């Protein structure tokens, strides 16, 4: 990941159900309304170091997971969309089972098409570790912790100190986001460009970072428990969102659509695949439109 720091986003275990639930759906762990168009995500991690990875480590033999190699770097093909439109819970042409023996692991990105092929009663205990980078100049499309700070009190002292440090890393990132948002609110172009380049140093993919920031600005308005919400007044939150309205409109179509293989299960106006013909300078210019 070429990062100064790496922190766990999630620590979990996959276990077999008590009853046979059969296969799940082929999917990428993203939605168009939450992470933005797929093109932005794969453009970013092709051009820059990866900022997010998932590990599955099997404690017992596990062949539940299937992957479609290379699909994290491209759109679905027409043939794949046709097959997925018929059924999202059958083997997909080109998909391969990941046959883990006890002690084996597989590392992958959650934007790849993958499938839990059979939730049966066969014993399954597979650890999942999800990591994100800090300090490699990329904002990952998943950048929030699923673990709660209260867990630190239950950890050994040395491990608790590490998790306290992880919270500090996230706090510093929120501080930087706040500086970016305040520059947008105040139409301070110089500070905006400077701080955005700090958050996402790669020129390629910086627009993807801006799309992710637009999603954060949306959450500030509507999610009362967002950890950054209290940093801004209600007027500031509304003004910030107004700066993003034009970009948000470009990320939508006139009528709802649904592309198979995403976590979206209902049609949405938010575009699944292509990024708009719009760059960071266009975004700055839109503040006065």
Positions of PLM-derived features:
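Non-heme Fe(II)/2-oxoglutarate
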Residues: 112-289
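Non-heme Fe(II) oxygenase catalytic core, chiefly the N-lobe of the double-stranded beta-helix
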Residues: 1-102, 115-122, 129-143, 225, ...
């Amino acid at each position: 990941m070429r990062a100064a720091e790496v922190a766990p986003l999630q620590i979990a275990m996959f276990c077999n159900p008590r009853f046979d639930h059969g296969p799940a759906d082929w999917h990428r762990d993203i939605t168009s309304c939450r992470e933005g168009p797929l093109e932005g995500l794969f453009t970013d991690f092709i051009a820059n170091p990866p900022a997010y990875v998932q590990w599955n480590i099997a404690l017992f033999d596990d062949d539940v997971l299937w992957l479609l190699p290379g699909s994290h770097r491209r759109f679905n093909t027409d043939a794949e969309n046709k097959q997925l439109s018929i059924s999202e819970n059958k083997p997909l042409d080109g998909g391969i089972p990941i046959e883990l023996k006890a002690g084996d692991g597989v590392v992958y990105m959650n934007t790849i098409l993958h499938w839990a092929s059979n939730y049966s009663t066969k014993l399954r205990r597979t650890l999942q570790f999800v990591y994100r980078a800090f300090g490699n100049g990329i904002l990952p499309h998943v950048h929030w912790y699923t673990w709660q700070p209260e867990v630190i009190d239950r950890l050994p002292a040395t491990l608790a100190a590490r998790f306290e440090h992880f919270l500090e890393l996230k706090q510093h990132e929120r501080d930087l986001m706040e500086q970016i948002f305040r520059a947008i609110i105040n139409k301070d172009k110089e500070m905006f460009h400077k701080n955005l380049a700090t958050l996402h140093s790669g020129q390629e993919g910086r627009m993807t970072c801006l799309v992710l920031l637009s999603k954060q600005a949306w959450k500030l308005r509507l999610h009362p428990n967002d950890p950054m919400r209290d940093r801004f007044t209600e007027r500031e939150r509304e003004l910030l969102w107004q700066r993003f309205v034009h970009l948000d409109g470009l990320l939508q179509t006139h009528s709802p659509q649904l592309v198979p293989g995403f976590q979206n299960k209902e049609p949405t106006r938010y575009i699944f695949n292509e990024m708009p013909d719009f760059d960071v300078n266009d975004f700055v210019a839109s503040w006065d439109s």
